[in-house]
Design a protein with these regions (language model features):
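Acidic, contiguous internal or C-terminal segments within carbohydrate-active enzymes
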Residues: 1, 21-64, 477-478, 585-619
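Extended Gly/Ser/Thr-rich low-complexity repeat segments
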Residues: 2-13, 40-54, 62-63, 195, ...
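Aromatic- and carboxylate-enriched substrate-binding clefts and catalytic-loop regions
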Residues: 6-10, 15, 51, 60-61, ...
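Catalytic and substrate-binding clefts that recognize carbohydrates or anionic sugar/phosphate headgroups
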Residues: 23-208, 219, 231-232, 523-544, ...
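Active-site mouth loops of central-metabolism enzymes
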Residues: 204-224, 275-280
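Catalytic domains of carbohydrate-active enzymes, especially glycoside hydrolases
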Residues: 221-249
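Catalytic core of carbohydrate-active enzymes
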Residues: 317-318, 327, 338, 343-344, ...
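Extracellular/luminal ectodomains and secreted, surface-exposed scaffolds of diverse proteins
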Residues: 641-679
Length: 688
């Protein structure tokens, strides 16, 4: 770091570990040695470089001295096989080798910037955060330098990157990973970890306006109308739900807020407000009426990234100052540090098939700047159609946070609006998202601790696979560690160009097996199918079917298992609502599965006793195992006691036991236990 001033985008400058490097004069440069790398400071002209700990392999090197003036530019050498990620939310982009990125808001269309961040990282193992609120421009496509040969025989071809901000100062943090996940952790050590969402925030949000006179409905609206016109219909159509903004729109106020919040809560909704005039009423809105979400707008946040970040902070802290529950902010303009408080959203857009296509790398690219809660409106706010709505919704259920916004297009954006078959398909995917809450919640906690997002560009999970590094796989992503999603973004019910990294992969819907290192074309995906593939060894925890968080107890835990070798999943749970987890009130449950690799043999499932505690933790649980297997087992034991083979009917009626279904996704073993203590280790063995 060079002469850093503490800006609001820095979260905790006093908590950084101070490193005491060993300095030496090496003639043409000063050498600063740490346990992981060496920093060279060349004397004439002054330039910086980073090498490995042996001072032989170059990691980065400035090609020329910093250029100061009205703008400050850093020029870096780059290798021909080097790729770059970060730069915040850039519409339609996540990988920048040979490209340019605006580090300022330029718009909401493809190839524009909606939520920039002055940060990037490289496949060479380093990252840079420019500590500034000044707009900038990063060009990873310069070619004017001569090639350079290094001591270790490495040749750095004459490519450069020019990194510019509109100010006459230079203040930067450099990170050495070497992995991309390490770099995200380092970056968020400085700018702050992504906020930990309450579990209800992982359900679909619904935004509309019920105090706007020009609304196109043709009938007078008042805030309480949201209850009968929207909330009750979610109940009528058996639709999962979680949060709602009844005053989403310019000019919206609200009436009878306290009773509206109460009635919406009875129907499974948390209530938020579009906040246009600041947060001066937030004590009343949150503390007395019970709202839990603020949507911000430039109308009061003001122009500039510092104002926007301070607005997020004020709203977030305003919520948390008036309740023990967690803050939630919907931001218009993000920057480095926004991830501490807010979801970042890609803007007001017209939906079509291209909208779906380019939002895949938009969201995964934002994740590569630690924006775990990056999202966009389902089917945009303008345009759209029944099919684009359904296709857009079905892939977004595999991301942490998403919402709809009604009142701008001819058709509203509730999931039942287009009727059959779309209503049924939308319900299917929303119910799946609810069931996947323990999986998503665990990965959101990982994001909160490390900066690594849940919706991951393929390169983040498979960094050694060169196919994943550039835009080749930009239209697919990993949801957590185990689920790969390849959305359909054309009118045809076919998805081409699906890439499988090394290992075995299984179709989530049919169980068909695919070998890694290969491509798949012409995957048939009818409208009710989003291509999803499960990685070998997967452990996917699921809660019971429910329409909102807390509707039913979650004391039955399903484990969707794809045994292959030794794998594990460290389930994270807390009360799902309050900030008591910050006091240590949470529990981890390590779930481990061991089996032969790709062969028939004994499958052992170990469920460790819960480590930690919190109010409401289940002391006992029933476990349902849904295990991929191409053949029927000969026996199943729970805690070394034999489990009886039973009929599917008895199983579904709640009886303890197991059965094998050869017709279910190429073979599944179903196991149901009685209620077992979560304070003791549990072992389930499936023998063949």
């Amino acid at each position: 770091q060079l002469l850093a001033q503490t800006l609001d985008c820095i979260a905790a400058p006093d908590t950084l570990v101070v490193i005491d490097p060993v300095m030496a004069d090496n003639g043409s440069y000063y050498k600063f040695t740490t346990s992981q790398c060496v920093v060279r400071v060349y004397k004439n002209p002054i330039r910086f470089a980073m090498y490995d700990k042996n001072n032989r392999a170059v990691i980065y090197e400035e090609a020329e001295p910093l250029a100061f003036g009205l703008k400050t530019t850093q020029t870096m050498r780059r290798s021909g096989d080097e790729d770059f990620y970060g730069c915040g939310m850039q519409q339609g982009n996540f990988s920048y080798a040979g490209k340019e990125a605006d580090i300022e808001v330029t718009g909401w269309d493809e190839d524009q910037s909606s939520n920039p961040a002055p940060f990037y990282m490289s496949t060479k193992g380093y990252g840079v955060f420019r500590n500034t609120f000044a707009p900038g421009h990063y060009a990873f496509n310069g070619t004017e330098m001569l090639d350079k040969n290094y001591d270790d025989g490495f040749k750095l071809m004459g490519f450069t990157s020019q990194l510019t901000h509109n100010e006459n100062r230079f203040d930067a943090f450099y990170f050495y990973g070497p992995s991309l996940k390490d770099l995200l952790n380092d970056y968020t050590d400085i700018t702050g970890k992504p906020f930990m969402p309450a579990m209800w925030m992982l359900t679909m949000g619904d935004a509309d306006c019920y105090n706007k006179g020009e609304q196109r409905t043709g009938w007078p609206q008042s805030t309480p109308d949201v209850i009968s016109q929207v909330a009750d219909k979610y109940v009528e159509y058996d639709m999962p739900r979680g949060w709602i903004l009844p005053n989403d729109g310019y000019g919206c106020g609200y009436v009878k807020l306290d009773s509206v919040v109460t009635e919406l809560g009875k129907r499974g909704f948390h209530t938020g407000l579009w906040t246009e005039n600041g947060v001066d009423k937030i004590a009343y809105e949150v503390g007395k009426c019970g709202t839990r979400l603020c949507k911000l707008d430039v109308a009061w946040v003001g122009e500039g990234y510092e104002f926007a970040l301070n607005g997020c902070k004020s709203a977030f802290e305003g919520i948390e100052s008036n309740t023990n529950e967690r803050g939630f902010v919907w931001a218009v303009c993000g920057w480095a540090g926004t991830q501490r408080y807010s979801t970042v959203w890609s803007g007001d857009q017209v939906s079509n098939w291209d909208y779906i296509r380019y939002h895949i790398p938009t969201i995964t690219g934002a994740g590569l700047s630690a924006m775990n809660a990056a999202t966009s409106d389902v089917d945009g706010i303008f345009g759209g159609s029944p099919k684009t709505y359904t296709r857009d919704l079905q892939w977004k259920v595999f991301t942490p946070i998403f919402m709809t916004m009604s009142g701008w297009a001819d058709a509203d954006r509730q999931p039942w609006v287009y009727g059959h078959p779309y209503t049924d398909i939308n319900r299917k995917f929303l119910k799946l998202k609810m069931r996947l809450n323990p999986y998503a919640y665990t990965y959101c906690h990982e994001a909160h601790m490390t900066g690594v997002p849940m919706a991951r560009a393929m390169v983040l999970e498979f960094p050694d696979d060169v196919v994943t590094r550039d835009t080749t796989t930009q239209y697919q992503f990993m949801s957590g560690e185990w689920m790969m999603v390849a959305p359909v973004y054309t009118r045809k019910n076919v998805r081409d160009s699906i890439y499988f990294p090394a290992g075995e992969w299984y179709d989530y819907w049919t169980g068909k097996k695919y070998e890694g290192g290969k491509w798949l074309d012409k995957y048939e995906a009818k409208l009710d199918i989003c291509p999803v593939f499960i990685r070998q060894g997967a452990i996917i925890p699921m809660y019971p079917d429910m329409n909102y968080v807390g509707e039913k107890p979650a004391d039955v835990l399903t484990l969707d298992l794809y045994p292959y070798g030794n794998t594990s999943f460290n389930l994270y749970e807390d009360d799902g609502l309050t900030r008591d987890y910050k006091k240590g009130e949470f529990a981890r449950t390590l779930i481990s599965v061991s089996s032969p690799k790709g062969e028939k043999g004994t499958i052992t499932v170990d469920i460790a006793k819960a480590k930690g505690d919190y109010k409401g933790r289940y002391q006992e649980r029933t476990y349902l195992l849904d295990v991929r297997s191409e053949s029927s087992p000969s026996n199943v034991t729970v805690a070394e006691k034999p489990l009886s083979a039973i009929s599917p009917e008895a199983f579904n009626a709640g009886q303890e036991g197991w059965y094998f279904d050869a017709s279910d996704r190429m073979g599944r073993v179903k196991v149901r236990t009685n209620r077992l203590s979560t304070n003791q280790d549990q072992k389930i063995v499936i023998g063949f």
